[in-house]
Amino acid sequence: MAELVIGLPRIERAVDMLSESIEPLLKSYGSLALPLPKSLCTDLVVEGIGGSEQSIEALSLKYYNPSLVRIWWSVIKKIPRLALEHPDSEIICYDEDTRPEKLEKASYRLASLLIRARLKIYERIDPRPWIEFFKPTSTGSIEIPETPVVIADGYVRFKEILGTASWKKAEKIWKLIPTPLELLEMIAKGYLEEKHAEEAVRFSVRYLGDYVIGSRDLTEAYEKLLNDKEYLDLLRRIDPNIARDLNPKIGRARTV
């Protein structure tokens, strides 16, 4: 049973806040699980200890594309040092290994969907290709290690872990809501009714085409989403509980 499950949005600011908490969590609980590729953690411990930041980045790029490395960099670069300084503690990565080439291919598919949708922005959008994009490629679920602390990135993963694992306490870092893309993922997985699909696609187009492309990083794009009254109204229509914690103090975890 996990003593603590922590959920955070997949953005730079939230990961930086998590990075500041990892060492205290290790000292308090002894081990924790991170949503990073399994082999990345192994490589960071076996090959990363004593290496430069450039060598650690090169190891990371074996499993992540540059944008994901940027998001997780403050945590990734700490793992070799923590493994050296806390030999009796354990950091386990539980996500499946994915090659950067596969991530890039998915990015191209998503960009293609975005371009086609923007050309039809004033017409009825067919959400089926978007739902198909987010359908799981395997029937099995990710195996969560039996560690005292489990970190979950993204709203969907946080809720999946809370729904399948045994846990005592759950907290959120910063403000955690599903992005429009996660709404589509929830529809594809059967967690959300398909009647919300067309609105989810329209907000996905806005999120990607206006917020992500027009921002310096994902943190800024996410902040724009948090201030999008239309989108927040959609979330409240879907489930009033989703947007209930939109104003926590920055830097503090919130108990679910």
For each feature predicted by the language model, list its residue ranges.
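Compositional signal for N-terminal targeting/processing segments
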Residues: 1-256
